[in-house]
Amino acid sequence: MKDNNEVLKLFIVSDSIGETAQRMIHATLTQFPDLTQVEIKKFPYIKDEQEFLNVLQLAKEQNAIVATTLVSESFNALGHQFANEHQIPYVDYMSELISIIKQHTHAKPLMESGALRKLNDEYFKRIEAIEYSVKYDDGKHFTDIGEADALIVGVSRTSKTPLSMYLANKGYKIANIPLVPEVAIPDNVFQQKNLKVFGLTASPNYIANIRRNRAETLGLSSESNYNSLERIKKELSYAEEVFRKLNATVINTEYKSIEESAFYIEKFLAKR
C-alpha cells in the first residue's frame, strides 16, 4: 500500500467462526487510526483444502492480507507454502504458538477447532446459572422454578445458599427455598414432576449452635425463639413433611463441607 487512501483488505480464514483472528485484527487496527479504508472479509468453517486454496487465490488477486486461525497442520502447511510462492502477506495466529507451547511444556494440544467458542459457551452457561441461582435464592421467586436443575430446601442455617452458589459456579441452575412452618410453599412447586429436590438437614443442637453464633456476629441476642431447641425441632419436623411431599433426597450437612454436599448432589444430577 502506498498511501492511507487505498483500501486495506484483510481476509480472515478459520476452521471455526473466526472470532479469535477478528479480535486480533481489530485490536491491531486500533494502532493505525489514520487507516480509514479497511475491508475485512471472513471465511469461516473452512474444512476443504480446495476451498482454502480458492480463498488464497482470491487474496492474491485482491492484494489482501490473510490472517488465519487454523488448527489443522496440513492446512497451515498448505497456507504457508501458497503464501511464500505467491508473496501473499500471511499471518498464522495459531500454529506457531501451539508449537512453541508444545515444545516448552511437552503438553499435547487438543488440535480441536472452535475450542475457544466451546470455552465461551461454557462460560456463558455458568453466568446464566449464577444469575438464575441468585434470582431464585431463598425463595425469592417461584415462577420458572421448573427450569432449575435442582431445588434445595431446608430450614435456616443448613447451608442452602452457599451450596446453591457453589453449584451455580459449576453451571447448574439451582433454586432454594427456606422451610418455615408458618410460610406455605406455593402449589406450583409441588406440581413440578421432573424437578430433582434435595432436602438439607442437621441435628437440632448443631443448628442451634450455628444460629447462636450467627446472632452474636450480627450483634443480636443469642437467646431467642429462633435459636431455641424447641423451635428448631418444630422446624425440622415440618421440613421432614416437606421432604416426603417433594420426594426429596435428604442430605445431612452436619460437619460437612460445601464441597462434600455438592459432590453428593452432582452424582445424582449426573444420572439424569
Swiss-Prot record:
Keywords: Kinase, Nucleotide-binding, Serine/threonine-protein kinase, Transferase
Keyword Kinase: yes
Coiled coil: none
Keyword Kinase attributed: yes
Family in the record: Belongs to the pyruvate, phosphate/water dikinase regulatory protein family. PDRP subfamily.
PANTHER family for the chain: PYRUVATE, PHOSPHATE DIKINASE REGULATORY PROTEIN 1, CHLOROPLASTIC
Binding site for ADP: 154-161
Function: Bifunctional serine/threonine kinase and phosphorylase involved in the regulation of the pyruvate, phosphate dikinase (PPDK) by catalyzing its phosphorylation/dephosphorylation.
UniProt name for this protein: Putative pyruvate, phosphate dikinase regulatory protein 2
EC code(s) of this entry: 2.7.11.32, 2.7.4.27
GO terms for MF: ADP binding; ATP binding; phosphotransferase activity, phosphate group as acceptor; protein serine/threonine kinase activity
Species of the source: Staphylococcus epidermidis (strain ATCC 35984 / DSM 28319 / BCRC 17069 / CCUG 31568 / BM 3577 / RP62A)
NCBIfam families listed in its UniProt record: PRK05339.1
Recorded catalytic activity of this chain's protein: N(tele)-phospho-L-histidyl/L-threonyl-[pyruvate, phosphate dikinase] + ADP = N(tele)-phospho-L-histidyl/O-phospho-L-threonyl-[pyruvate, phosphate dikinase] + AMP + H(+); N(tele)-phospho-L-histidyl/O-phospho-L-threonyl-[pyruvate, phosphate dikinase] + phosphate + H(+) = N(tele)-phospho-L-histidyl/L-threonyl-[pyruvate, phosphate dikinase] + diphosphate
